[in-house]
A protein has these predicted regions:
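Conserved hydrophobic "DFG−1" position in protein kinase catalytic cores
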Residues: 27-28, 40, 88-89, 97, ...
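Conserved hydrophobic alpha-helix
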Residues: 120-127, 134
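AlphaC helix (C-helix) of the protein kinase catalytic domain N-lobe
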Residues: 60, 64-67, 124, 181
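Conserved structural core of kinase catalytic domains
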Residues: 53, 65-68, 72-118
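Catalytic-loop of the protein kinase fold
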Residues: 129-145
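ATP-binding glycine-rich loop module of kinase domains
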Residues: 11-65
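C-lobe/activation-segment region of protein kinase-like
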Residues: 146-225
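Juxta-kinase regulatory segment immediately upstream of eukaryotic protein kinase catalytic domains
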Residues: 1-16, 211-212, 222-224
């Protein structure tokens, strides 16, 4: 049986108030120092929480558990009822929060080592080989540089299995993931993009233009955060 957390013994902080079809997001801190993120659709309308809410909670927990051993996703994911889930809080910064280095600005040194992006890209290829794509890695809020410098990928609600898809479709979806990561690599370390990675990025861009694949956003309000 999964361990439970007493509501009377936990410090609960609202991080995101949610919206029409978005979960409220909380930070939970237990007396023994464990920290979790909680996503809760309970505050949405009856229709939303019983359709989108149930579906997304079940979906995200499924992929987090499937990939937990890779070390690139938050651990201890579990459902807390039909509309709510918890996962371990990942201490660190998202790639969106880290400023792009500017050689013209004193003190604007690159804070992310090249090795981080190689680790991230290789881990993503392993995930693809296991038959899973993320599909929202253009959103740099979903890519974390953890406190120990390792990559962590968040928000698996858009993910899908690719085992049963036709090879051209599978490669198309994998290219969507690859482009998100390689664009971030090119943003922070353009000098480290070798010919192979540069070709992969250009290929992914061509595929995107050909099929007009728009970037995935939850809401306009979220995109501005």
């Amino acid at each position: 049986m999964e361990p439970t957390i007493s509501n009377r013994s936990v410090k609960k902080t609202l991080l995101h108030k949610g919206g029409f079809a978005n979960a409220k997001i909380y930070r939970l801190e237990t007396p023994d120092g464990e920290v979790f993120i909680e996503k809760d659709f309970s505050g949405c309308s009856f229709l939303i929480r019983n359709t989108i809410g149930r579906f997304l909670i079940r979906r995200e927990v499924h992929y987090l558990l499937r990939l937990e051993e890779t070390g690139i996703v938050p651990g201890k994911a579990r459902r807390i009822g039909p509309f709510c889930m918890r996962e371990t809080f990942c201490d660190g910064q998202t790639l969106r929060e880290i400023p792009k280095p500017n050689p013209k600005v004193p003190g604007s040194e690159n804070r992310i080592p090249v090795a981080y992006f190689h680790t991230l890209f290789n881990a993503l290829q392993n995930i693809h080989q296991s038959g899973i794509v993320h599909l929202d890695l253009h959103n740099l809020r979903n890519i974390i540089v953890s406190a120990d410098g390792t990559p962590v990928l968040l928000d698996w609600q858009s993910a899908i299995h690719t085992r049963l898809l036709l090879p051209p479709i599978r490669r198309l979806l994998e290219n969507i993931d690859n482009m998100g990561v390689l664009k971030a690599f090119d943003k922070f370390h353009p000098e480290a993009m070798n010919d192979e990675l540069s070709k992969k990025l250009e290929h992914a861009k061509k595929i995107r233009r050909r099929f007009w694949l728009p970037r995935i956003h939850l809401t306009r309000k979220d995109a501005k955060k």
